[in-house]
């Protein structure tokens, strides 16, 4: 279910304070663990270091990211491909 419009987008307080302190286009990266925060128009032009569970992924916010969550742009899982079929490898030799 979608969030109620009257509540507005969710942004963690500590992220909102850091964004208010920074100016747009500044080179300083805002480090955050808050993957659940919604990207608002105030975030445009800022770079966030979003934690993916292991390391921080740099995310530069653009206009078309508004309304999405920060965590959507820092994948948590890596796909290394499906396991190879051992039987087919033996037949080829």
Curated annotation (Swiss-Prot):
What's the protein here called? Small ribosomal subunit protein uS19
Q: Does the keyword RNA-binding apply?
A: yes
Identify the gene encoding this protein: rpsS
Organism expressing this protein natively: Geobacter sulfurreducens (strain ATCC 51573 / DSM 12127 / PCA)
Q: Which GO terms describe its biological process?
A: ribosomal small subunit assembly; translation
Signal peptide residues are: none
Q: Which domain of life is it from?
A: Bacteria
Q: Which GO terms describe its molecular function?
A: rRNA binding; structural constituent of ribosome
Keyword terms: Ribonucleoprotein, Ribosomal protein, RNA-binding, rRNA-binding
Q: What does this protein do?
A: Protein S19 forms a complex with S13 that binds strongly to the 16S ribosomal RNA.
Quote the cellular component terms of the Gene Ontology held in the record: cytoplasm; small ribosomal subunit
Similarity comment text for this entry: Belongs to the universal ribosomal protein uS19 family.
Xref: InterPro entries: Ribosomal_uS19, Ribosomal_uS19_bac-type, Ribosomal_uS19_CS, Ribosomal_uS19_SF
| PANTHER family registered for this protein in UniProt | RIBOSOMAL PROTEIN S19P FAMILY MEMBER, SMALL RIBOSOMAL SUBUNIT PROTEIN US19M
Q: Which residues form a coiled coil?
A: none
- Per the UniProt record, one Pfam family is Ribosomal_S19
């Amino acid at each position: 279910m979608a969030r109620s419009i009257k509540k507005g987008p969710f942004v963690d307080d500590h992220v909102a304070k850091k964004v208010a302190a920074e100016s747009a286009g500044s080179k300083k990266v805002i480090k955050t663990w808050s993957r659940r925060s919604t990207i608002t128009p105030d975030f445009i032009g800022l770079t966030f270091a979003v934690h993916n569970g292991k390391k921080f992924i740099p995310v530069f916010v653009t206009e078309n990211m508004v309304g999405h969550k920060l965590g959507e742009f820092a994948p948590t899982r890596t796909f290394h491909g499906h396991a190879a079929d051992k039987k087919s490898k033996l037949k080829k030799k």
